[in-house]
Amino acid sequence: MSKVTPQPKIGFVSLGCPKNLVDSERILTELRTEGYDVVPSYDDADMVIVNTCGFIDSAVQESLEAIGEALNENGKVIVTGCLGAKEDQIREVHPKVLEITGPHSYEQVLEHVHHYVPKPKHNPFLSLVPEQGVKLTPRHYAYLKISEGCNHRCTFCIIPSMRGDLVSRPIGEVLSEAKRLVDAGVKEILVISQDTSAYGVDVKHRTGFHNGEPVKTSMVSLCEQLSKLGIWTRLHYVYPYPHVDDVIPLMAEGKILPYLDIPLQHASPRILKLMKRPGSVDRQLARIKQWRKICPELTLRSTFIVGFPGETEEDFQMLLDFLKEARLDRVGCFKYSPVEGADANALPDQVPEEVKEERWNRFMQLQQQISAERLQEKVGREILVIIDEVDEEGAIGRSMADAPEIDGAVYLNGETNVKPGDILRVKVEHADEYDLWGSRV
């Protein structure tokens, strides 16, 4: 009787943004396909992979701590991801790391795993890997990454130095993945990249093929095709190019969710110029007004930076005035912090930490009031809600206006006879600055 060789076991730590999560899913899918077992503890693992984030200082620190914990608990560690692009920085703190690769280096990661933990010779588990691959999100939603890298050179950002220039995935490949996800039960697809609106720019929007039909490689064409799948499609990381205007009618027609995540970063033309971002606030306000005219249900999410080098009280007041005028639904705000390798570090007139803190508090106080007023307008209305969690007290879901992890929730007390992924019609009964409460219609 032949002896059964135990499956080699790999531990995995995934840090950072949804784009990094997709990279982790791809590596895990390859490992499972090759017959490796992925285990949840360091003790049982033959080796640990840490997929790092390196965007801001706190993320670097979290990544270094995760690497240290994996080394202490296991000893055999491979590092990949954004921080992996800075090998010297990792080796200085953790010289015992076996191998280090940068982001989206899937083949290199697998080669390193093969070197230290050889592939199993017999793989009876191949058929157990689902066609859509290993997913780290709940079954009813998934991230769909359409490109890698970015062509912009914002002075506060080092992503291009880590992930390179824009490389768009073939549109046929993207749409085939989307179809596999829907076939596997996904009800909501979240389109992500470093710059979603630039999709196809690097290949001059060439025509690709899906199911034998020609399809242009562009954000608008992608949205048109995804709308045929009969699921919720949500756009993230949309740089404010002029052609973003073209997706608003698709939202008004119900083809994709009326939700736009569009990072604006500031409202002072002078600060935007220092950031190397587009700088016409009046034009942006006019666009927002026009978008809402075309699609009254539109939810706008954005992110901003306060305390950027050179930001005066006058610049900051322009930002507050913009918030009052734009009345955005969902807003994230970050206090500027120097990122190693960013051009903004060399700018004069760095803003003191106490001023950053004070401005951040004023920003958040104003935006919370605006967000609360925007949500209060929904009380008494009926909305669609996708269920995320159910327990003995009721269900928690999200409206079309809420992306997972970053936006609010809809609480349905006592609604226990539903399951994650169900989409319900709900009457809104109460709201605060972030969340809604309601009951099933």
UniProtKB/Swiss-Prot annotation:
Cofactor binding note of this UniProt entry: Binds 2 [4Fe-4S] clusters. One cluster is coordinated with 3 cysteines and an exchangeable S-adenosyl-L-methionine.
EC number, as in UniProt: 2.8.4.4
Reactions this protein catalyses: L-aspartate(89)-[ribosomal protein uS12]-hydrogen + (sulfur carrier)-SH + AH2 + 2 S-adenosyl-L-methionine = 3-methylsulfanyl-L-aspartate(89)-[ribosomal protein uS12]-hydrogen + (sulfur carrier)-H + 5'-deoxyadenosine + L-methionine + A + S-adenosyl-L-homocysteine + 2 H(+)
Cell location: Cytoplasm
Binding-site residues, [4Fe-4S] cluster 1: C17, C53, C82
CDD domains: Radical_SAM
SMART domains in alphabetical order: Elp3
Pfam families reported for this sequence: Radical_SAM (PF04055), TRAM_2 (PF18693), UPF0004 (PF00919)
Keyword entries, A-Z: 4Fe-4S, Cytoplasm, Iron, Iron-sulfur, Metal-binding, S-adenosyl-L-methionine, Transferase
Family: Belongs to the methylthiotransferase family. RimO subfamily.
NCBIfam families: 30S ribosomal protein S12 methylthiotransferase RimO (TIGR01125), MiaB/RimO family radical SAM methylthiotransferase (TIGR00089)
Name of the protein in question: Ribosomal protein uS12 methylthiotransferase RimO
Gene name of this polypeptide: rimO
